[in-house]
Curated annotation (Swiss-Prot):
It is a multi-pass membrane protein. It is found in: Cell inner membrane. The modification FMN phosphoryl threonine is found at residue 187. Belongs to the NqrB/RnfD family. Keywords: Cell inner membrane, Cell membrane, Electron transport, Flavoprotein, FMN, Membrane, Phosphoprotein, Translocase, Transmembrane, Transmembrane helix, Transport. Its EC number is 7.-.-.-. It is an enzyme of class 7 (translocase). This is Ion-translocating oxidoreductase complex subunit D. It comes from the Bacteria. GO terms for cellular component: plasma membrane. The chain crosses the membrane at residues 20-40, 42-62, 69-91, 123-143, 215-235, 242-262, 267-287, 301-321, 322-342. InterPro entries: NqrB/RnfD (IPR004338), RnfD_bac (IPR011303). The gene is rsxD.
Length: 352
């Protein structure tokens, strides 16, 4: 059995590639705005840091490879990689982490394989996973949404936190993570998993401030809905196809519904899975990467469904609260196999 991987991305010229990448950046604006609203200025600062790092790293590698720097940077792929990594990490993560993660994504996960169209794994998720495994504490230190935060840093304090780790008054991440109830806060998925391990019931957990009056966690449901709006825009513009996001979301919802039906005391509800963490970001902006996803319609359905199952398994039984990045990379591994068995039959061709 021989695997044949067609050259990608599956667009015919640089102008078309640039247009699609730019549309994805535009579609990300609602999600970026929502994250900035609920979690502060850090999201924007991380995007700027990641974008600069991505462009500089790409330019350096292209120069070393004696390729045209200007023409390659104009496809916006490096910019998009930096953006996706930046919105995936905590807004007050140290500056060197986003630089390290973005540099690794561009230099190792993308350019080392030959550049755009040759990388088998999503570069942004490679960078994210490297950071998560190397610095788990910093990568899970999300601020509580402003609605339930005891202290919210302003623009200058946000910059100080990113570059020095302290606010002007000497506050640190431990202080800023405290909610209005006086308890250090985490993301809804992280809170759910940690509290279950501590012996709390689902009924008790859902009374925590992070879930107060919300379907899937204060702030997080609106962030996910904002990414959903961007995803619908991409579908409307035909920048992505529906197969991957629909199969991913339906499979995740089905797994979550079945799990919740049979074990409501230990497993999260479908709405928590769908509207928390990086669900919508992953469905429309990460899994749909034309370079690392399946290239056939049937293959896209299988690819999305596989990622949905993996996200549910990792969230429900794994060691990490959110499993989107790991699910994406594991699904990327299967793409050659999926494409091999879902490639349309060529009429008139017979195996000799």
């Amino acid at each position: 059995m021989v695997f044949r991987i067609a050259s990608s991305p599956y667009t015919h010229n640089q102008r078309q590639t640039s247009r699609i990448m730019l549309l994805v950046v535009i579609a990300a604006l609602p999600g970026i705005a929502a994250q900035t609203w609920f979690f502060g200025w850090g999201t924007l600062f991380q995007i700027v840091l990641a974008a600069i790092t991505a462009l500089v790293a790409e330019a350096i590698v292209l120069r070393l490879r004696k390729q045209s720097v200007a023409s390659h940077l104009q496809d916006y792929s490096a910019l998009l990689t930096g953006l996706l990594l930046a919105v995936s990490i905590p807004p007050l993560a140290p500056w060197w982490m986003v630089v390290l993660g973005t540099g690794f994504a561009i230099i190792i996960a993308k350019q080392l394989y030959g550049g755009l169209g040759q990388n088998p794994f999503n570069p942004a998720m490679i960078g994210y996973v490297v950071l998560l495994i190397s610095f788990p504490v910093q990568m899970t230190s999300w601020l509580p949404p402003y609605e339930i935060a005891a202290t919210t840093p302003d623009m200058l304090d946000t910059l100080r936190m990113i570059f020095s780790g302290h606010t002007a008054s000497g506050g640190d991440m431990t202080l800023l993570r405290i909610g209005i109830d006086g308890i250090s806060q985490a993301t809804p998925l992280d809170t759910f998993k940690t509290s279950l391990r501590a012996g709390h019931s689902v009924e008790q957990i859902m009374q925590y401030p992070i879930y107060s009056g919300a379907l899937a966690g204060v702030g997080w449901q609106w962030v996910n809905l904002a990414w959903l709006v961007g995803g619908v825009f991409l579908l409307w513009q035909k920048a992505i196809r529906w197969h991957i996001p629909v199969s991913f979301l339906l499979t995740l919802a089905l797994c979550a519904a079945l799990g919740w039906l049979f074990s409501p005391a230990t497993l999260a509800s479908p709405q928590l899975h769908l509207l928390s963490g990086a669900t919508m970001l992953g469905a429309f902006f990460i899994l749909t990467d034309p370079v690392t996803a399946s290239t056939t319609n049937h293959g896209r359905l299988i690819f999305g469904a596989l990622a949905g199952v993996l996200v549910w398994l990792i969230r429900s039984f794994g060691g990490y609260p959110d499993g989107v990045a790991f699910a994406v990379l594991l699904a990327n591994i299967t793409v050659p196999l999926i494409d091999y068995y879902t490639r349309p039959r060529v009429y008139g061709h017979r195996k000799g």
